A protein has these predicted regions:
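Domain-level signal for soluble alpha/beta catalytic cores
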Residues: 1-201
Length: 201
């Protein structure tokens, strides 16, 4: 894994945006969490759309036509889903960029998305570029994954990059939320990413 040159002193960075203010989804999660923590007996809380967060995964299409994926997202929104999470090359398969589908869902459905960020396919430079682009384009919810090995897909001899693993990307995003890149350099503003990973990332 790449270990960027570290500055001699730990950079101070900016104060991160509070979790509840990063996205609409993070605001709802924060409210639900506080209600559960403060409840005398959280097991007796009635599950309603207001106190339960719903995220459903929709995969990008394997070709050029995103219609079925967008219609699936539309149906899920009408059914009460809060957010659509969009996979990044699941099972090491070739599909449309999840960044593209995320933008279509945002534009056509005005629905928040969670973008999967996979360590497998991008080096340290590409990961940073794609994350900064996603932020500028309004995608602030991330699920960080290491990624399935290429041998599971149609191109078993494809090169897996893995400059960073999922934990390394989480650390990088944490730095971005303080306005600092992996080399410790400030870039003038802080991102407001809400990031998550799997229990076995």
């Amino acid at each position: 894994l790449v270990q960027p040159d570290r500055p001699s002193a730990e950079p101070v960075g900016l104060e991160p945006v509070p979790f509840a203010e990063r996205t609409r989804f993070s605001k709802k999660i924060d409210r639900i969490w506080r209600e559960r923590v403060q409840a005398p007996d959280s097991s007796k809380i009635k599950i309603t759309p207001d106190n339960f967060a719903v995220s459903v995964e929709v995969n990008p299409p394997p070709g050029l036509d995103p219609t079925s994926a967008i219609e699936a997202a539309r149906m899920l929104k009408e059914g009460g889903a809060d957010v659509i999470n969009i996979a990044d090359g699941p099972r090491a398969s070739v599909r449309m960029s999840n960044q593209a589908l995320a933008q279509l869902v945002l534009r056509e459905l005005d629905m928040e998305v969670i973008l999967h960020v996979c360590a497998r396919d991008r080096n340290l430079l590409g990961l940073q570029s794609d994350l900064l682009a996603a932020h500028v384009l309004g995608v602030h919810n991330l699920v960080i994954i290491t990624g399935d090995p290429p041998k599971l897909g149609d191109y078993p001899h494809a090169t897996a990059v893995f400059d960073l693993d999922s934990i390394g990307i989480l650390r990088m995003v944490k730095g971005f939320n303080r306005g600092i890149d992996p080399a410790g350099k400030a870039f003038g503003a802080a991102t407001r990413f809400m990031s998550a990973c799997g229990a076995e990332p």
